[in-house]
Swiss-Prot record:
Any Gene Ontology CC annotation: membrane
Start-end of Acidic residues biased regions: 13-24
Keyword Transmembrane helix: yes
Disordered: region residues: 1-25
Parts of the chain that traverse the membrane: 29-49
Main subcellular localisation: membrane
Record's subcellular location: Membrane
Annotated GO biological process: adaptive immune response
The organism's taxonomic lineage, starting at the top: Eukaryota, Metazoa, Chordata, Craniata, Vertebrata
Protein name (record): IgW transmembrane form Tm1T3/Tm6T3/Tm3C4
Alphabetically ordered keywords of this record: Adaptive immunity, Immunity, Immunoglobulin, Membrane, Transmembrane, Transmembrane helix
UniProt tissue specificity: Expressed in the spleen, pancreas, peripheral blood lymphocytes and at low levels in the epigonal organ.
Membrane topology reported for the UniProt record: Multi-pass membrane protein
Amino acid sequence: VQAVPPDVKGEEGKEEVEDMDGDDNAPTVAAFAILFILSFLYSTFVTVVKVQQ
């Protein structure tokens, strides 16, 4: 009985990963990319402002 739950979780985990690789993961990746770009632009902006000052 103890050996069954890990196997079931493993199978469900693989299925969830496969689903996330599809349409479900696209918004997450897009949001992460947008946040990364915004943070990069913000850090660049702060650096430029400091240099000008």
